[in-house]
């Protein structure tokens, strides 16, 4: 068959392609073929939103143009025939005009690293094309599928809200009060307290003008109106794509290719082919078949075409619900409820109703409801039409109930509900939106005579087995029973007996899932009872009071953000930018997609791609490695092994590639080099390795302790007389807390490009790294070259957080080796799953403590032991342990303290630095100890915190003097700003009247030491050139990874040289211009490099002083020309030797830190005791920032770090299998905070400026400190859990573990449902996952 031609538009320009490979997705095509690099690769599975574009299509049936967001990483190029694609470049640019969305996100300070920003822009843009004045709920829905690791989302939401309708009301009357009227817990604030400083002027924003948008191409409209004559066929190397254009063609194609999947949005088949190794040689993708888009309201039900997207289904259901009487819409409302939280907007607009039904995923949110409602599927074939029930047999793929191979799903009919029929749907996930359900359920009951006697009952659960499960026997036995609590108890017993979840069930969380089975049943019972009461109050009593709080899920509510920052000094010159909220200087480029990251760089001539082969075993000997099949594949050039590297394979105590054994799943074994990325990855899958498992296999901290498996010797600090203090203590307790690890989840994965220069063995490296010098050194060592022949360049990094240092150097060294060996450029971009598997993250911690204290809560003795899971190599683990010990006391003076730390050697990928560097773990252990002391003393944790807090001038446990007046000020200000006492009383009142939902309030202090522990690690350099036109080029050793260091450095130059910031340019960081620079991290990047930049500027000014003094009113252009004429150098090197710092671990004493950042945070939450869900109601943060160089950037660091910390402590859960494999390898399984997790109210306050003569303009580094404040949310949750436990007569204290996920919250709120579930005997099964 002759290949078809593909026509579509991109940014208003026609694209014509022949011979399209069906395996080509839109994302790589945009970057490689069209050089549109603004659309980013973040995960490859539609889970992060970085690749969002807008797709526009003309609907021949309605005559309307539909604009919707889509994930380019999952959009097959073949599917775009007749569509118009808009990328971020097509929305606006610096060369043409900025779109209001781009302008407002940038000027609202909504970008940091900028890698997620194009996706954010496109999600908002697509929303505005359909809803020019959206509601706040529509805004939240539009951004639910976009992840950001830097900003904390608040400034992005602020930008989006400028387009919203003036009323931001939640449109509901939760507890009978509108969200705009109720304050928090009924505590109203004074009018003045609700105002906020402006960081940008909304009046200056360009108004949105829908008439100025790109029009839909008339050519495509004409093309769509013409009835196509025949199916389109595209044939690639491995896959054939058939696009039938009529139902007849579709049925014919399916008859000829009965095993071929029918693909509409590619959101199910696409990930299966990419991540699960499923292969389909033929794919059928209908295009524009009207019968697949039918919407028909009949007398008995609603018929929806299988080709409708889930977003279209959502819109249709919302319209129909408004038209029909309530009694007919039970099923429709249940489906709507599930659709609101199902995936992100991009996926809902791509995925089809038919695809969702036919995929029959075990955790499908719609199928349990559709099956419970007895829906019917219409399935034609060439042999005729059939109707089959969508029931449990269909969902379990029973051959007698399934579609025949030649049939297609055409439509589904959803029956209207009847009077006295009730349908409900529930789901529980790790995150409120855009997260797969852990358990979901569809439930329907029918009381035929309206007498409360069950005539029909249907309950289907998802997420509890290999397929959706129907509790058939339980439902049958309950028919004829009255709807009473006795019936409920019997129903719970029957369901638990029928729906069995084995202890070793895939997915884990077994007891939680069992509890949800009956918790959801209880909620269904209550909702039906309440409906019965409304319909016939005489017969059915109201549930108001006892059970009212259990009826509904948590409501997210209205969002508000305020901040009180610092203003610039009134005495400084107007043009002096220091202290002013200057926008991130790459902000506009972030929003237009013009900011270039490593993988955006153009292809180099004859460039190669590299893909790694990693170990599938955690501890094993390599018996053999067969490369023959991989080497025989087309395009494969070479495979690099440890043997090729020789003695260069080893550096420090690590190896680049495995030699004779592997130490973890994800250990690098070899690297495949091929002409393209696709060829390299396919070849990597063909490398055959034979292993022999070795003993012992050590994964957990407990196993490491058992096998005495540790790196180095322990680290120890001690002050006072601990033994004597314990003897005199009035009370003593012992406890422990386990804290899980955390994935960096920088939005840009590990990326590098090695380019041999062609002579003298020179090589240039373009790497996404925090430490170019280290990359340079390791690569030079591997290539056996002097360092001066290896140059590392970094323009910007798409997020790092400590994760782009050690492992990045290993990846870069192997990439550079391949490049130099073949004298060709080599590019290596890790996929998200590879990145998460290989690179490690934050160390899991086990903290054990013994504490002696007085009855007033004052701690007199503390003996603490830290165990960190370091993984298979040492990496940064020793320094993490050290920093954890040095910072462990947080804000408290413990007079007698002993603390020890151990780095456990295990068979996991090496863990490494992550924002906070040990303090988020060690600080949490201390706070958990404080909470337990408070419970033992019958005091609030806040009272115990105050009793033990540093006061005035003190000495730390390592002997450094500390002045803590600002700490006390932060604490008292936070208490006042948060109206803590009033809200504490309000929370208690709420809890007294709400048995099933509880609120919690917690406040934690912060003392974060800043410094790197040695002088040498703190040195920095800068280079400043003044050109003859008066412009300045600045280079320094710091890396721009989102924190705005380049912006701050240009502010420094502007102040020192008294010139506009626009006159100063900074191209990036390079070992060629500033050699031997230290790592960018530890909150000191701006501090150290800023002092070097300041030194360079002052050197220049001193050199030019005679010239300037002769012409004081001259311009820089005139001064530069005069200096040149007098042979005076216009270049200056600035240098800062580093802060004075030392630490003697033998003596346990020293002065490792230059200064301390102080702060406090108060958070309020509400939990759902039935499901474990929680919502973040409000957070107040007070920070001591010294004198802020840029309040807007500093606010972004505080908020972003807080949200990242909140994720660490509540939702981000790494899951490992019992053989050491990481399960959580992408946003589908690993849940960082999303827009829905941001506190409804977030208030940030900076203390007035303070002076510190040693730092840059008295500023303080804020990159890491805010992470720890996220634990205020954890302790607020625990406060709520404790309230629930006290009410149930349970001990208020229970061993804390972190993260405090919905599973842990629910299981801690013990009740009759947790007690009725079956329990497995430990040791009788192998659990699906292990706690490492």
Curated annotation (Swiss-Prot):
Its cofactor is [2Fe-2S] cluster; FAD; Mo-molybdopterin. The keyword Cytoplasm applies. Transmembrane segments: none annotated. It catalyses: an aldehyde + O2 + H2O = a carboxylate + H2O2 + H(+); retinal + O2 + H2O = retinoate + H2O2 + H(+). [2Fe-2S] cluster 2 binds at residues 113, 116, 148, 150. InterPro entries: 2Fe-2S-bd, 2Fe-2S-bd_dom_sf, 2Fe-2S_ferredoxin-like_sf, 2Fe-2S_ferredoxin-type, 2Fe2S_fd_BS, Ald_Oxase/Xan_DH_a/b, Ald_Oxase/Xan_DH_a/b_sf, Ald_Oxase/xanthine_DH-like. It is found in: Cytoplasm. Pfam families: Ald_Xan_dh_C, CO_deh_flav_C, FAD_binding_5, Fer2, Fer2_2, MoCoBD_1, MoCoBD_2. [2Fe-2S] cluster 1 binds at residues 43, 48, 51, 73. Residues 4-91 form the 2Fe-2S ferredoxin-type domain. One of its GO terms (biological process) is xenobiotic metabolic process. GO terms for cellular component: cytosol. Mo-molybdopterin binds at residues 112, 150, 800-801, 1041, 1082-1085, 1197, 1262. NCBIfam families: mam_aldehyde_ox. AOX genes evolved from a xanthine oxidoreductase ancestral precursor via a series of gene duplication and suppression/deletion events. Different animal species contain a different complement of AOX genes encoding an equivalent number of AOX isoenzymes. In mammals, the two extremes are represented by certain rodents such as mice and rats, which are endowed with 4 AOX genes, and by humans, whose genome is characterized by a single active gene. This is Aldehyde oxidase 1. It comes from Cavia porcellus. The lineage of its organism: Eukaryota, Metazoa, Chordata, Craniata, Vertebrata.
């Amino acid at each position: 068959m002759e290949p078809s031609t593909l026509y579509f538009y991109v940014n208003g320009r026609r694209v014509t392609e022949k011979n399209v490979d069906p395996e080509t997705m839109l994302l790589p095509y945009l970057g490689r073929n069209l050089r549109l690099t603004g659309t980013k690769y973040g995960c490859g599975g539609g889970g992060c939103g970085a690749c969002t574009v807008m797709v526009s299509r003309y609907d021949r049936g309605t005559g309307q143009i539909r604009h919707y967001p889509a994930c380019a990483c999952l959009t097959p190029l073949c599917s775009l025939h007749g569509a118009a694609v808009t990328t971020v470049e097509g929305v606006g640019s610096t060369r043409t005009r900025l779109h209001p969305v781009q302008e407002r996100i940038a000027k609202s300070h909504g970008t940091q690293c900028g890698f997620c920003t194009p996706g954010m822009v496109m999600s908002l843009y697509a929303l505005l094309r359909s809803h020019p004045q959206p509601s706040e709920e529509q805004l939240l829905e539009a951004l639910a599928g976009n992840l950001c690791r830097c900003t904390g989302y608040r400034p992005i939401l602020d930008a989006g809200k400028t387009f919203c309708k003036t009323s931001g009301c939640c449109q509901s009357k939760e507890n009978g009060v509108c969200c705009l009227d109720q304050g928090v817990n009924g505590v109203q604030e004074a009018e003045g307290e609700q105002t906020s400083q402006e960081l940008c002027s909304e009046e200056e924003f360009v108004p949105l003008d829908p008439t100025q948008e790109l029009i839909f191409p008339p050519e495509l409209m004409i093309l769509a109106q013409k009835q196509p004559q025949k199916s389109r066929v595209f044939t690639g190397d491995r896959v054939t794509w058939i696009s039938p254009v009529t139902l007849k063609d579709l049925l014919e194609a399916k008859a000829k290719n009965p095993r071929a999947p029918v693909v509409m949005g590619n959101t199910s088949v696409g990930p299966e082919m990419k991540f699960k190794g499923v292969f389909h040689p033929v794919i059928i993708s209908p295009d524009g078949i009207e019968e697949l888009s039918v919407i028909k309201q009949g007398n008995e039900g609603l018929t929806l075409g299988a080709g409708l997207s889930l977003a279209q289904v959502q819109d249709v259901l919302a319209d129909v619900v408004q038209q029909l009487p309530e009694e007919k819409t039970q099923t429709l409302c249940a489906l709507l409820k599930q659709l609101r939280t199902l995936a992100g907007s991009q996926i809902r607009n791509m995925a089809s109703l038919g695809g969702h039904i036919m995929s029959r995923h075990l955790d499908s949110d719609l199928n349990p409801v559709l099956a419970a409602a007895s829906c019917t599927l219409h399935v034609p074939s060439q042999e005729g039409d059939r109707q089959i029930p969508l029931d449990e047999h269909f969902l379990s793929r029973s051959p007698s109930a399934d579609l025949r191979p030649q049939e297609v799903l055409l439509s589904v009919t959803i029956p209207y509900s009847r009077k006295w029929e009730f349908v409900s749907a529930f789901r529980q996930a790790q995150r409120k939106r855009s997260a797969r359900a852990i358990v979901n359920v569809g439930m329907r009951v029918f009381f035929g005579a309206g007498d409360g006697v069950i005539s029909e009952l249907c309950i289907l659960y998802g997420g509890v087995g290999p397929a959706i499960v129907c509790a058939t026997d339980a439902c049958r036995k309950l028919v004829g029973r009255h709807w009473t609590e006795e019936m409920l108890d019997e129903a719970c017993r029957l369901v638990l007996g029928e729906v069995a979840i084995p202890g070793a069930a895939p997915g884990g969380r077994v007891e939680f899932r069992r509890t949800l089975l009956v918790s959801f049943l209880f909620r269904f019972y209550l909702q039906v009872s309440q409906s019965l009461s409304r319909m016939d109050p005489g017969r059915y009593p109201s549930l108001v009071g006892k059970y009212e709080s259990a009826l509904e899920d948590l409501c997210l509510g209205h969002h508000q953000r305020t901040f009180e920052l610092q203003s610039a000094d009134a005495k400084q010159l107007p043009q002096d930018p220091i202290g002013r909220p200057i926008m991130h200087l790459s902000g506009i480029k972030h929003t237009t997609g013009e900011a270039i990251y490593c993988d955006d760089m153009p292809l180099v001539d004859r460039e190669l791609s590299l893909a790694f082969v990693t170990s599938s075993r955690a501890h094993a000997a390599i018996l053999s490695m067969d490369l023959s099949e991989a080497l025989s594949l087309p395009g494969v050039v070479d495979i690099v092994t440890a043997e090729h590297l020789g003695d260069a394979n080893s550096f420090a105590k690590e190896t680049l590639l495995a030699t004779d054994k592997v130490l973890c799943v994800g250990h690098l074994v070899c690297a495949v080099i091929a002409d393209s990325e696709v060829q390299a990855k396919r070849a990597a899958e063909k490398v055959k390795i034979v292993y022999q498992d070795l003993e012992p296999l050590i994964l957990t901290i407990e196993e490491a302790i058992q096998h005495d498996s540790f790196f180095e010797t322990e680290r120890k600090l001690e002050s006072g007389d601990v033994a004597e203090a314990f003897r005199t203590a009035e009370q003593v307790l012992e406890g422990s807390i386990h804290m899980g690890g955390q994935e960096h989840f920088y939005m840009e994965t590990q990326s590098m490009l090695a380019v041999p220069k062609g002579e003298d063995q020179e090589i240039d490296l373009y790497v996404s790294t925090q430490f170019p010098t280290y990359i340079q050194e390791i690569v030079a060592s591997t290539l056996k070259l002097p360092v001066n022949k290896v140059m590392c360049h970094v323009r910007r990094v798409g997020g790092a957080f400590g994760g782009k240092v050690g492992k990045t150097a290993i990846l870069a060294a192997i990439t550079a080796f391949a490049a130099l060996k073949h004298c060709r450029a080599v590019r290596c971009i890790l996929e998200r799953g590879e990145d998460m598997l290989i690179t490690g993250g934050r160390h899991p911690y086990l903290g054990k403590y013994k504490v002696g204290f007085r009855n007033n809560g004052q701690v007199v003795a503390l003996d603490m032991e830290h165990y960190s899971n370091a993984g298979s190599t040492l990496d940064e683990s020793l320094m993490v342990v050290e920093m954890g010990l040095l910072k462990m006391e947080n804000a408290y003076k413990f007079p007698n303290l002993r603390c020890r730390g151990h780095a456990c050697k295990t068979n996991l990928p090496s863990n490494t630095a992550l924002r906070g560097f040990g303090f988020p773990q060690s600080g949490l252990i201390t706070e958990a100890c404080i909470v337990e002391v408070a419970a033992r003393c019958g005091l609030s944790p806040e009272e115990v915190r105050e009793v033990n807090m540093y006061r005035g001038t003190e000495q730390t446990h390592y002997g450094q003097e500390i002045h803590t007046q600002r700490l006390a000020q932060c604490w008292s200000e936070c208490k006042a700003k948060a109206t803590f006492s009033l809200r504490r009383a309000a929370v208690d009142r709420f809890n007294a009247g709400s048995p099933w939902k509880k609120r919690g309030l917690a406040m934690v202090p912060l003392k974060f030491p800043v410094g790197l522990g040695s002088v040498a690690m703190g040195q920095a350099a800068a280079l400043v050139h003044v050109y003859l036109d008066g412009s300045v080029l600045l280079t320094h050793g710091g890396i721009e990874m989102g924190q705005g260091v380049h912006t701050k450095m240009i502010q420094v130059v502007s102040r020192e040289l008294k010139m506009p910031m626009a006159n100063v340019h900074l191209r990036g960081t390079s070992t060629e211009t500033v050699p031997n620079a230290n790592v960018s991290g530890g909150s000191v990047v701006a501090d150290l490099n800023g002092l070097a930049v300041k030194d360079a500027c002052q050197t220049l000014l001193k050199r030019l002083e005679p010239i300037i003094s002769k012409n004081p009113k001259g311009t820089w252009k005139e001064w530069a020309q005069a200096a040149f004429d007098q042979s005076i150098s216009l270049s200056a090197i600035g240098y800062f030797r580093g802060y004075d710092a030392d630490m003697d671990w033998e003596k346990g004493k020293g002065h490792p830190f230059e200064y301390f950042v102080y702060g406090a945070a108060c958070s309020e939450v509400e939990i759902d005791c039935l499901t474990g869900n929680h919502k973040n109601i409000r957070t107040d943060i007070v920070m001591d920032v010294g004198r802020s160089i840029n309040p807007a950037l500093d606010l972004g660091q505080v908020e972003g770090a807080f949200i990242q910390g909140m994720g660490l402590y509540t939702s981000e859960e790494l899951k490992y299998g019992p053989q050491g494999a990481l399960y959580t390898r992408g946003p589908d399984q690993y849940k960082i905070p999303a827009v829905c997790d941001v506190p409804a109210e977030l208030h940030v306050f900076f203390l007035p400026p303070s002076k510190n003569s040693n730092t840059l303009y008295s500023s303080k580094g804020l990159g890491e400190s805010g992470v720890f404040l996220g634990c205020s949310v954890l302790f607020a949750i625990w406060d709520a859990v404790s309230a629930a436990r006290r009410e149930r007569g349970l001990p208020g204290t229970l061993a804390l573990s972190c993260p405090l996920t919905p599973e842990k919250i629910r299981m801690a709120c013990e009740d009759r449902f947790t007690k009725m579930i079956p329990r497995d005997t430990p040791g009788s099964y192998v659990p699906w996952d292990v706690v490492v």
